Amino acid sequence: MMLEGYTVQPPQSTLIGDIEIQDENANQEVKNVLYQGVQKGIKRLEKRQRRVALGDVTSQKANKIHNAIHNKFHQTKNNFEIENIRSSALVKEQQRDVRHEDSDYFLIDSSEGSSTDDEQVNEDAIDDLLSRRVNDQQIQADEVYEDFDGEMQDVIEEDVDSQIEPLSPINNDEIQTELDRAFEKYFRSVPNPLDDDTHDVVMVVEYASDIFYYLRELEVKYRPNPYYMQNQVELTWPFRRTMIDWLVQLHFRFQLLPETLYLTINIVDRFLSKKTVTLNRFQLVGVSALFIAAKFEEINCPTLDDLVYMLENTYTRDDIIRAEQYMIDTLEFEIGWPGPMPFLRRISKADDYDFEPRTLAKYLLETTIVEPKLVAAAPSWLAAGAYFLSRTILGSNDWSLKHVFYSGYTSSQIIPLASLILENCKNASRRHHSIWKKYFDQKHYRCSQIVEEWIVSTEA
């Protein structure tokens, strides 16, 4: 069943990119070329210094020493593989020849079709790509992930036409009754003097209920169309997963906030809900969304030079700036999507802000960004599902009225979501490799390992 308010309608007929691939075999070749930038991209990525998040401006010398030590430590071969989603330099060069000069220069109206000259450019570019492909058949295997090439082949061969039905919480009279009971028991019009939050000015307890009521409105207002992929000509859900895998690694290298990553994915999905994007411009959309989100959420955000370097000069500073302008204009400057992190912190209040379930929930929550069924899911619901599952893994199987009050969801609404998250955590190193690898680190308390071991123990 489709979500209320959404129907499958063609978006505005605009294609990002100046060359449309007409020949099916040629299009397959371009998709194959898509994965050949892996080795170069990650080597350049690994050489970059890590950004010190929220660094003290008075300790720049200490930061330089830290970065020097860090870079020396990371001279070994990288443990992360990156999907550098890009077309060949030849195709990009041909695109620049036919760019528009206005603010939409990197866009082409799909209703206009391709001119004879453009078709000739396509044929020449593809012929060159095919000849270069014959001379470059060997791709080095990933040390950490030996089946990486096999996974990429699975992505190409996957049935991209299969229908993805979005998942959403159920609502009925019984659920509403339980929500009302929780509200009556725990809602206070006057702050509780025995609550520590009451005496913390940062928590603004007088306005907490109003704030989260407003955030619940925003999460509905800024949700993407869950069926937008049906209107994309060249993109598929597997390509979106590959893009997110790359963005997760870029986000990790820059040491950005979790809110920045979630907002980046929301911007990408909302933009794709309104515009049709070609494959050779998909990476530009992703990096521009990250740039926008970082400006919105961070104190220290990546510079244009940082992003151009990470893209291995596939795109220029001007490309990113113009793409940023166009995307913001398309979204009508509405980028204040709340994301799941405020809701996760709110729910943890039911357990007196217990560190363990909230930390484990961060890993489970991040895995949801690659799931097509959860593209339009409310972030408050995703946070509740991740927290519910984390408590279950840690041995707490109850979901009290207090949890219902602070989350806004009953256990019957959350269980289907928690089941989907758990299913996606099986064979996690293949389904969301970068997220799994990131949370396997001691810095993140090896959360992905904890989940893996729990799954094995329950299935034994």
From Swiss-Prot:
Keyword annotations of the record: Cell cycle, Cell division, Cyclin, Mitosis
Pfam families linked to this entry: Cyclin_C, Cyclin_N
PROSITE patterns, per the entry: CYCLINS
Residue runs in coiled coils: none
GO cellular component, one term: nucleus
Cell cycle found in the keyword field: yes
Top-level taxon of origin: Eukaryota
SMART domains: CYCLIN (SM00385), Cyclin_C (SM01332)
GO biological process, one term: positive regulation of mitotic spindle pole body separation
GO MF entries: cyclin-dependent protein serine/threonine kinase regulator activity
Note: Present with 98 molecules/cell in log phase SD medium.
Job description of the protein: Essential for the control of the cell cycle at the G2/M (mitosis) transition. Interacts with the CDC2 protein kinase to form MPF. G2/M cyclins accumulate steadily during G2 and are abruptly destroyed at mitosis.
Family: Belongs to the cyclin family. Cyclin AB subfamily.
Protein name in UniProt: G2/mitotic-specific cyclin-4
Species name: Saccharomyces cerevisiae (strain ATCC 204508 / S288c)
Protein's gene: CLB4
